[in-house]
Amino acid sequence: MAPDISKKRLPCKVLVFNLPPTLPEQVFLQSINSFLPHVEWHRFSKGKATVGTRSELLSFAYLKFQSATAVQEFFRVYQGHTFIDKKNNTYRAIVTIAPYQKIPPSKVKADSLEGSLEQDPKFQEFKVQRESYSQTASNDDVIEKLQTSTPLLQYLAEKKNAVVEKGKSKPSKKSVKAKKKLRLAEKPASNNSKAGKSSQESKKSSKAPAESAAAVIKEDKVSDRKKSKKKPKKTPVSNSTASQASENASDKKTKEKKSSGKQKIASKKKDQLTTDNV
């Protein structure tokens, strides 16, 4: 849409977009050749064609005209200008008013201080001090100044020295390992000696109750022998008990005789029966 001339401040910067992505800048300038005398500034941005899955980026251009009448004429002539690329794709140019009307300055302001370093008084003083310092100062002085220590550096140095001294006083790992080996070698010998002593003590302790038990057994045997050697006292037998014993003995003898006679009679009867049957 063309700008209105009745406005006090007329926009003169124009944006032309929807141009082919492969359009060269020279071809675009040739298409606006009749308007170039009225253009005081321009910028062209070339697009990119499709590559793989990437979509194309269209080209665009900014034009700054000298007057509003030239802008209106450009809108009337160039709006919808057609371009055809190699693949027969058609593109129609679209002309609009640029949203930002300012343009970068054509001339860069020169710095007033450029090339004036040698005339600067502070720089000259620095040069003089450096020359005098290089002439008077020697390497030893510089080293001494560099080696000046602060309380913090002194504290760190003392701490480091203390750590080094502790490390020297501590035995090395090899000596510690050797001492451990000696201790391990001494332990079995001491254990063996302790075991020998304990075994001897246990033997002695076991012998003591055995000896006491043997002594008790001997005493019992001696006492039994003494008892067996002693003769038992004969108890006096009365006349009544003696007569009863003799009667009992005679009764047993008569009973035995009777039983033997009965057995003989039974055996004789068996012999007779056997002879009769034959």
UniProtKB/Swiss-Prot annotation:
GO cellular component: cytoplasm; nucleolus
SUPFAM superfamilies linked to this entry: RNA-binding domain, RBD
BP term (GO), one: nuclear-transcribed mRNA catabolic process, 3'-5' exonucleolytic nonsense-mediated decay
Biased composition (Low complexity): 207-216
Ranges of biased composition (kind: Basic and acidic residues): 249-259, 268-278
Protein's cellular compartments: Nucleus, Nucleolus
Gene Ontology MF term list: mRNA binding
Chief location bin: nucleus
Keyword Iron tagged: no
Bias (Basic residues) ranges: 169-182
Region named Disordered: 163-278
Alphabetical UniProt keywords: Nonsense-mediated mRNA decay, Nucleus
Gene3D superfamilies per UniProt: 3.30.70.330
A Pfam family assignment: Smg4_UPF3
PANTHER family in the record: FI21285P1, UPF3 REGULATOR OF NONSENSE TRANSCRIPTS-LIKE PROTEIN
Similarity field: Belongs to the RENT3 family.
Role, per record: Involved in nonsense-mediated decay of mRNAs containing premature stop codons.
Protein name in UniProt: Nonsense-mediated mRNA decay protein 3
Species in which this protein is naturally found: Schizosaccharomyces pombe (strain 972 / ATCC 24843) (Fission yeast)
The gene coding this protein: upf3
